């Protein structure tokens, strides 16, 4: 009995709470914990607040750190951070970006890099809640982050501070969801297993424009800019749904599942969102206005839209796809532009200025209008054609087919019938000789003809009667 009591007592001692007082003038509980300022709380083994700057500012308080090795690190006495969870980390930086987003809440002591806020408590800080979370100034990250492996175009490792930092260095970024990662200024990810990736590592400010304002809402989505060649990749991309992807694209909009937009990108005049020597906009309202003007002035970047499922665009600009399994592709030297596609299983390849509504159309020429479905897939390789109706076809450039199964096959240059000579006219004027392909309302080769009714008398010699 005595041995049992002693053993029980030893177990209780071995499992006792780690309530060892830590260091600092704040509230610090836990072995190796540290709360360096009054009004700061650090609870947990190795939990600590760290202030690298020596501002001498009196109002340095409000940081809350709870969890094993949870940390807030402020470069210059910024305060108000929250880090909750094992290895949660908040890094409050000082630099041109931080000054740009200060919105005149405080003055800085110099221009450009190295300028320090006169009132550090007026500079925004971060909130990280969940194991292995990491955010920079102004950021919010909530959720468990223990994934190690490939996601989008990067490989993440949440084991170390340095690796976590690579995936989440965007200022004012927001991540809500387990094992999602956001590296973009004012970028937002909501949902699990998403990524907004960048090669921005805090050094090359030119890379910081990647993913500015990018947004994901859903799961298994990726906005990939880490491997992109263009520093404006990801800017203003919006993805809503499941398993969608953009890569090396800006101004892209995706709503649905399984859609892909790649290489839909233009260079952007990003002066309005690029930190300079003299800080940034005077207010959030002004920044919002600046971004609206940037979007308008730059024609929304690559500006490709995909709504539905399984749509794919590559090397496109100013393109819209609505429906399922539509594909629009160009090349680096021949970008497909100004295409509008709605329906199912339509394809546009190396062509621009097309309107397709229906199913199973394959377009390889410019300036085509195809409205209506097809009973089987067909390739349109001649330009400037218009077909309206189910199974309507046009096989000559500029041909027009109107109605079910109509077929435009008569090319320009056909001479009109001269009743006076009872033969084709020899007059080569446009009155007698067509300068564009014919309009067809049937297919005489397949015994399909139509009357055209309710036609008024013509005014000119070239009017139908």
Task: Give the role of each language-model region.
Residues 3-465:
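Glycine- and small/polar-enriched repetitive beta-structure motifs of secreted/surface proteins
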């Amino acid at each position: 009995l005595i041995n049992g009591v002693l053993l029980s007592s030893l177990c209780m001692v071995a499992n006792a709470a780690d309530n060892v007082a830590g260091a600092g003038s704040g509230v610090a509980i836990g072995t190796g914990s540290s709360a360096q300022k009054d009004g700061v709380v650090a609870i947990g083994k190795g939990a600590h607040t760290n202030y690298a700057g020596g501002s001498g500012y009196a109002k340095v308080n409000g940081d809350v750190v709870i969890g094993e090795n949870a940390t807030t690190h402020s470069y210059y006495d910024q305060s108000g951070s929250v880090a909750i969870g094992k290895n949660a980390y908040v890094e409050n930086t000082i630099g041109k970006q931080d000054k740009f987003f200060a919105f005149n809440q405080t003055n800085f002591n110099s221009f450009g890099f190295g300028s320090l806020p006169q009132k550090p408590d007026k500079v925004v800080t971060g909130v990280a809640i969940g194991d292995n979370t990491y955010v920079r100034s102004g950021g919010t990250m909530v959720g468990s982050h223990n994934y190690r492996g490939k996601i989008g175009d990067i490989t993440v490792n949440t084991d170390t501070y340095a690796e976590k930092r690579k995936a989440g260095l965007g200022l004012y970024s927001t991540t809500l969801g387990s094992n999602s990662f956001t590296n973009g200024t004012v970028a937002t990810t909501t949902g699990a297993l998403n990524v907004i990736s960048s090669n921005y590592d805090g050094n090359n400010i030119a890379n910081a424009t990647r993913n500015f304002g990018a947004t994901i809402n859903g799961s298994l989505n990726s906005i990939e800019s880490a491997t992109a060649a263009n520093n404006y990749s990801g800017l203003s991309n919006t993805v809503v749904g499941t398993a969608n992807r953009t890569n090396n694209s800006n101004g892209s909009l995706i709503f649905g599942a399984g859609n892909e937009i790649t290489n839909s990108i233009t260079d952007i005049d990003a002066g309005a969102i690029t930190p300079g020597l003299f800080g940034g906009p005077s207010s959030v309202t002004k920044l919002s206005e600046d971004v609206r003007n940037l979007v308008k002035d730059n024609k929304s970047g690559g500006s490709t839209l995909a709504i539905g499922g399984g749509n794919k665009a590559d090397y496109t600009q100013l393109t819209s796809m609505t429906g399922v399994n539509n594909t629009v592709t160009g090349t680096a030297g021949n970008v497909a532009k100004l295409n509008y596609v709605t329906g199912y299983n339509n394809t546009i390849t190396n062509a621009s200025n097309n309107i397709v509504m229906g199913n199973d159309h394959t377009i390889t020429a410019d300036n085509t209008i195809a409205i209506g479905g097809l009973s089987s897939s067909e390739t349109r390789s001649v330009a400037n054609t218009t077909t309206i109706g189910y199974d309507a076809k046009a096989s000559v450039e500029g041909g027009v087919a109107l109605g079910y199964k109509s077929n435009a096959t008569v090319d320009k240059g056909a001479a009109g019938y001269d009743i006076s000579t009872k033969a084709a006219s020899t007059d080569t004027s446009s009155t007698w000789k067509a300068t564009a392909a014919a309009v067809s309302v049937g297919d005489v080769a397949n015994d399909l003809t139509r009357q055209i009714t309710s036609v008024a008398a013509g005014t000119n010699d070239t009017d139908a009667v």
